[in-house]
Design a protein with these regions (language model features):
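Ribonuclease/tRNase effector modules and their secretory precursors
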Residues: 1-85
Length: 85
């Protein structure tokens, strides 16, 4: 599986590095598809520092993903993926 992180992520969230996003994506705890076209996946995973990150990604090639949003997890995303009421 190939995971790419859009440069915009680090420009907007300087505390989140590309490797953090990849580790969180590959170790996803919970994710769900959004009703969009193309289908966007919102997910939550732990980064290499043990922080809980949220991400939004699209499959942009066979077995290839582009993460275009990532940051420290919010309550809204925890609820969206079913990890919080």
């Amino acid at each position: 599986m190939r995971v790419r992180v859009h440069p915009r992520v680090q420009r907007r969230h300087s505390d989140v590095e590309e490797d953090d996003v990849i580790v969180a994506f590959e170790g996803t705890l919970r994710s769900r598809a959004r009703d969009t076209h193309p289908i966007q996946w919102v997910g939550v995973g732990l980064d290499r520092k043990g922080r809980l990150l949220e991400y939004i990604a699209v499959e942009d090639e066979p077995d290839g993903w582009l993460v275009f949003h990532a940051m420290l997890v919010t309550r809204a995303v925890l609820a969206e993926v079913g990890l919080r009421r």
